[in-house]
Amino acid sequence: MSIRIIPQDELGSSEKRTADMIPPLLFPRLKNLYNRRAERLRELAENNPLGDYLRFAALIAHAQEVVLYDHPLEMDLTARIKEASAQGKPPLDIHVLPRDKHWQKLLMALIAELKPEMSGPALAVIENLEKASTQELEDMASALFASDFSSVSSDKAPFIWAALSLYWAQMANLIPGKARAEYGEQRQYCPVCGSMPVSSMVQIGTTQGLRYLHCNLCETEWHVVRVKCSNCEQSGKLHYWSLDDEQAAIKAESCDDCGTYLKILYQEKEPKVEAVADDLASLVLDARMEQEGYARSSINPFLFPGEGE
């Protein structure tokens, strides 16, 4: 089951009603998204062995909040959505959509915001990025989108991705279309941009009990039914793992068919869980899953595999 973005003027009234029943997509709600993430990261940093890094990630998330409002994006995506719909592609496909200079403008603004807060190696990294040429930055962005993580040092990747993510989230927030569910493949990827999820969440409120995967780039969430592998869509060999007990707010769903796992966060167990923050703060669970022989099917925007310089 895949999800395709349908332009507003191509939706009939019956399709609009169907889409309203179970929203296949939840476009990013940028108001307070980054502040909420930063607050959750700081909260989780208390008594966590990764506390220093969680506080570092909180600084980046807060900077994203500031830059979001200082550098708004104005863009008409109507033509792009129509073209992508005709091609059956995500409208903001990371492998197709040309990047304009706005994302590098966001990166420089993030660096300016973060500089007073950084010291030591972290400060050296952002100063290095500040001096990089336009082409060098584009090459790093292309490498990350191609999953060529060895070409971008793991200390630079979070800053590059923070700017790219903010840019893509701004674009996703402007999409003037609706979405509907269609049978197809590759629902393990974001239907808006084609990137990977960071984690999934069983929500409360108007989407009570529904599971949504959260994009690690454009911040869109998309519906995937529960008790089905989000990576291969099989359901016969799923297992659920937690570090605490069966009522834990964070679990890992593993699949013996494809050998991967993805974390599930349960808002009903802990209303404050946040897709990126709680995933990052629970790396002990990742270590356990690796010991069990499973590979992670997602990437956290603050923790990329790569080669340090």
Swiss-Prot record:
Keyword Chloroplast: no
Alphabetic keyword roster: Cytoplasm
Coiled coil location: none
GO CC list: cytosol
The keyword Cytoplasm appears for this protein: yes
CDD domains linked: FdhE
Major location category of this protein: cytoplasm
GO molecular-function term, one example from the UniProt record: ferric iron binding
Example of a GO biological process term: protein maturation
Transmembrane segments: none
Gene3D superfamilies: FdhE-like domain
InterPro entries: FdhE-like_sf, FdhE_C, FdhE_central, FdhE_N, Formate_DH_accessory
Disulfide-linked positions: none
Subcellular location: Cytoplasm
Family: Belongs to the FdhE family.
Function summary: Necessary for formate dehydrogenase activity.
Name the UniProt record assigns to this protein: Protein FdhE
Organism encoding this protein: Escherichia coli O139:H28 (strain E24377A / ETEC)
Gene: fdhE
